[in-house]
Amino acid sequence: MGMSVTISVATEQDAEQIFRLQYLCFQSEAALYGNYRIDPLVQTLDSVRQEVASDCVFVARLGEEVVGSVRGKVTEDGAAAIGKLCVHPRLQGHGIGARLLRAAEAALAEERGAKRFRLLTGHRSEGNLRLYRRSGYETVGRSRGADGVELIILEKQAGAYAATA
């Protein structure tokens, strides 16, 4: 019998595994846009450590290995910015990303008072867009990242997370 994937709050000890996983997972996004300077690939380990310490960060574990991660924080306007959702390439397509997203939504709404959730993804990232739309997110606009990538902005009301959980 194989091990099952568990979702839990990230700890300080997870930061290095999150950092490495993020670098691996976002290679395909970088290739999609021909841009290897996207934020997840240039973020420092110290910056990941700071996010784990201050933001709402969840990991998916298979045994002791971190195989997925997501981060979120409530912004000044009461929205929760959710980002850097990633799942190890060998485990994608098994619902781990959706589970991580639901865990972040629940914590951000219940523990940090988020009224709505917001996330951004590149305009060519069809797999990401499918996941987010299946999870109840709707496109509310577009912007351009500091790295030059055209981004789609998606949102949903915090009350809606329970319906997709």
What are these regions (language model features)?
Residues S47-V59:
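A short helix-loop-beta-strand connector motif used in the catalytic cores of GNAT acetyltransferases and
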Residues T6-R20:
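A short beta-loop-alpha structural element at the N-terminal edge
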Residues V59, E65-K73, A81, C86:
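Conserved beta-strand in the GNAT
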Residues A98, H123-G141:
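Conserved active-site alpha-helix within GNAT-family acetyltransferase domains
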Residues L108-T121:
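Conserved GNAT acetyl-CoA-binding A-motif
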Residues L91, G95-A103:
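Conserved acetyl-CoA pyrophosphate-binding loop and the N-cap/start of the following alpha-helix
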Residues F19-V48:
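Conserved GNAT-fold acetyl-CoA-binding loop/helix
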Residues P89-Q92, R118-L129, G145-V149:
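Conserved beta-strand-loop-alpha-helix junction that forms the acyl-donor binding cleft
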